[in-house]
């Protein structure tokens, strides 16, 4: 459990190797409240089977967003069209959906495929269907055409999902993002694995393997690096590692605690917890120069720092009030302000990308759940009903939270929308999974 005073010993052997996807997403709540959308299977214009069905990726993305609910393709009146010019509005008059996604895939040469995608405004088409013949282009919201390789099918499917999501909601899609997490495979000689994958668990890669525990991965703002804690030298040390080149640098190696690193919004500094002067306190360290600035100064434990988007303030967890609560500190003045009052404990907070809300772990009646606070009204909403929830990390578009929890006696990842309506579980095929961190936009 990510609570005050818990610091796991870390050690690692640096590795980089592909691995099979170990995560799947099981939607557990919220489908009925989602907006219906039609996704027509993309028309394959080649010989033999298609390398992959891009529309399957799009359907899964939209369903996992918690915002949309793709309707059963068997109920679609036209199931073999790829362009809006083939779209017959009258045939769609009884379909309860707000838009239609369609497209085609055509082989162009060795491992080269022309992918066409179009997004149609079904509501507009239905409203105008009774007004006589209309130009089909009137219904077209967006379209694109690109040549890609078979290896790029899944990524381009995520790109289409991003376009659809943004066009219909006004919010940038987060389907082309990654998550970092720790997998624990008990019984192995080096059971602790630091992994990264696409947001949906595909394209999983191992970055680190260790005989000792790993935790607290944190993404750099450009998505190229991870900060983490290691005990490989028999003491706590903070490292920053490039996920592409594997190059890494030791950032802090003070006596005692070196923990909970998190990148500043400009990527130049880390906020972290150090006990070099006695009690665990919040510090900020310059990654290049290693210059250190102490931020808090209190006899109680201060830990789990997180940045506001403007880089001028931090939130952190402290026991200075007698129990773990979340506080805000302004870096320029050092002024500290208590943020949370509801429940028994509040800890592990992070600020949403727009700076308007805070996601954190709330303990009430002995139960640890993920909660959201509106920073203007201070209204608190408990988002989850799972058990022993911890380590929340917010998607870069602010719509979803991934977190660690316990399911059937194992540590797993789960997700919840920031309005609490949509919930999903991300079980691992092998081992236990914890300490998730959602990447920035890539």
Swiss-Prot record:
<keyword id="KW-0574">Periplasm</keyword>
<dbReference type="GO" id="GO:0042597">
    <property type="term" value="C:periplasmic space"/>
</dbReference>
<dbReference type="GO" id="GO:0017038">
    <property type="term" value="P:protein import"/>
</dbReference>
<dbReference type="InterPro" id="IPR014167">
    <property type="entry name" value="Tol-Pal_TolB"/>
</dbReference>
<dbReference type="GO" id="GO:0051301">
    <property type="term" value="P:cell division"/>
</dbReference>
<dbReference type="InterPro" id="IPR011659">
    <property type="entry name" value="PD40"/>
</dbReference>
<dbReference type="InterPro" id="IPR007195">
    <property type="entry name" value="TolB_N"/>
</dbReference>
<dbReference type="Pfam" id="PF04052">
    <property type="entry name" value="TolB_N"/>
</dbReference>
<dbReference type="Pfam" id="PF07676">
    <property type="entry name" value="PD40"/>
</dbReference>
<comment type="function">
    <text>Part of the Tol-Pal system, which plays a role in outer membrane invagination during cell division and is important for maintaining outer membrane integrity.</text>
</comment>
<keyword id="KW-0132">Cell division</keyword>
<comment type="subunit">
    <text>The Tol-Pal system is composed of five core proteins: the inner membrane proteins TolA, TolQ and TolR, the periplasmic protein TolB and the outer membrane protein Pal. They form a network linking the inner and outer membranes and the peptidoglycan layer.</text>
</comment>
<comment type="similarity">
    <text>Belongs to the TolB family.</text>
</comment>
<keyword id="KW-0131">Cell cycle</keyword>
<keyword id="KW-0732">Signal</keyword>
<feature type="signal peptide">
    <location>
        <begin position="1"/>
        <end position="21"/>
    </location>
</feature>
<protein>
    <recommendedName>
        <fullName>Tol-Pal system protein TolB</fullName>
    </recommendedName>
</protein>
<dbReference type="InterPro" id="IPR011042">
    <property type="entry name" value="6-blade_b-propeller_TolB-like"/>
</dbReference>
């Amino acid at each position: 459990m990510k609570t005050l005073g818990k610091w796991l010993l870390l050690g690692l052997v640096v590795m980089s190797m592909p691995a099979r996807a170990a995560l799947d997403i099981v939607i557990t709540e919220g489908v009925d409240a989602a907006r219906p959308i039609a996704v027509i299977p993309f028309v394959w214009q080649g010989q033999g089977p298609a390398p992959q069905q891009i529309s399957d990726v799009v359907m899964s993305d939209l369903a996992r967003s918690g915002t949309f609910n793709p309707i059963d393709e068997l109920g679609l009146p036209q199931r073999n069209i790829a362009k809006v010019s083939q779209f017959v509005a009258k045939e769609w008059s009884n379909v309860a959906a707000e838009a239609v996604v369609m497209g085609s895939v055509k082989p162009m040469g060795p491992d080269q495929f022309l992918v066409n995608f179009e997004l149609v405004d079904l509501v507009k088409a239905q409203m105008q269907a009774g007004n006589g013949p209309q130009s089909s282009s009137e219904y077209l919201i967006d379209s694109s055409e690109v040549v890609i390789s078979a290896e790029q099918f899944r990524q381009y499917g995520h790109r289409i999902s991003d376009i659809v999501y943004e066009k219909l909601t006004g919010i940038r899609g987060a389907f082309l993002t990654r998550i970092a997490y720790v997998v624990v495979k008990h019984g192995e000689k080096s059971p602790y694995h630091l992994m990264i994958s696409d947001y949906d668990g595909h394209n999983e890669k191992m970055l680190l393997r260790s005989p000792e525990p790993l935790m607290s991965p944190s993404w750099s703002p450009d998505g190229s690096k991870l900060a983490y804690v290691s005990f490989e030298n028999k003491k706590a040390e903070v490292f920053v590692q490039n996920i592409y080149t594997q190059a890494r640098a030791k950032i802090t190696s003070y006596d005692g605690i070196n923990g909970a690193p998190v990148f500043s919004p400009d990527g130049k500094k880390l906020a972290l917890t150090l006990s070099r002067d006695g009690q665990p306190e919040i510090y900020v360290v310059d990654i290049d120069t290693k210059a250190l600035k102490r931020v808090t100064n209190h006899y109680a434990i201060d830990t789990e720092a997180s940045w506001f988007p403007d880089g001028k303030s931090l939130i952190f967890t402290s026991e200075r009030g007698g129990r773990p609560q979340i506080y805000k500190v302004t870096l320029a003045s050092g002024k500290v302000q208590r943020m949370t009052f509801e429940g028994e404990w509040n800890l592990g907070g992070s600020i949403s990308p727009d700076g308007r809300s805070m996601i954190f772990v709330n303990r009430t009646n002995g139960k640890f759940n993920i909660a959201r606070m509106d920073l203007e009204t201070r209204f608190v909403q408990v988002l989850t009903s799972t058990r022993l929830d911890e380590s929340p990390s917010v998607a870069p578009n602010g719509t979803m939270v991934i977190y660690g929890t316990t399911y059937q006696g194992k540590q797993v990842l789960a997700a919840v929308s920031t309005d609490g309506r949509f919930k999903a579980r991300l079980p691992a095929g092998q081992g236990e999974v914890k300490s998730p961190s959602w990447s920035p936009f890539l």
